Amino acid sequence: MDHHSKAKELLQQRDELDGKIKELMLVLETNNSTMDSPLLDAEGYPLNTIDVYAVRHARHDLICLRNDRAALTEKIVVEMENENKEVSGQTATSEEKPVHRTSNEPFVKISSVVELSPADIGGFRKDDLIIQYGNLHHGNFNDMQEVAQITKQSEDKIIRVTVIRENRPVRLEICPKKWSGPGLLGCNIVPISGANV
């Protein structure tokens, strides 16, 4: 199987995972719950306003599926990069063209992520250090307006992001979109200097 076919197959698998994740998120929303909201009352008894078993089961499955999705995304990126290497003389689209970073030095970080937001679904985690955001990296980054501009221009499109998490690079695909919360991502991105914008 060539790299293009393999990437297409992996994308289909990820779409199936996204469908399952959406169903599990609906279970949490129906029960007015999040990934870490309390399931017990002040006296230690299960809350009678939610389906405690369903919420616990959904949380467990969401953790597993998100890990599976992250692993699939890593494989997809590798296959697409290998495909680009094999195709000579063909102009890659702006979304497919690999960005050549001058270093792996982070320039912004994630200070908070709202649960069930596009950022959360895409795999952003609090304290992730971003070394690539679309075509932005430490070597060409000037200010946070560039991050905001890329996000706005990429509504309902994929932004390829590489973060440092637990001292290793993790590749993600983030899709900014309108959702029930504010903004298109549902996370707070700040400069490494710590100045919030």
From Swiss-Prot:
GO terms for biological process: proteasome regulatory particle assembly. It comes from the Eukaryota. Keywords: Chaperone. Acts as a chaperone during the assembly of the 26S proteasome, specifically of the base subcomplex of the 19S regulatory complex (RC). GO terms for cellular component: cytoplasm; nucleus. This is Probable 26S proteasome non-ATPase regulatory subunit 9. Residues 75-166 form the PDZ domain. Belongs to the proteasome subunit p27 family. Pfam families: Nas2_N, PDZ_6.
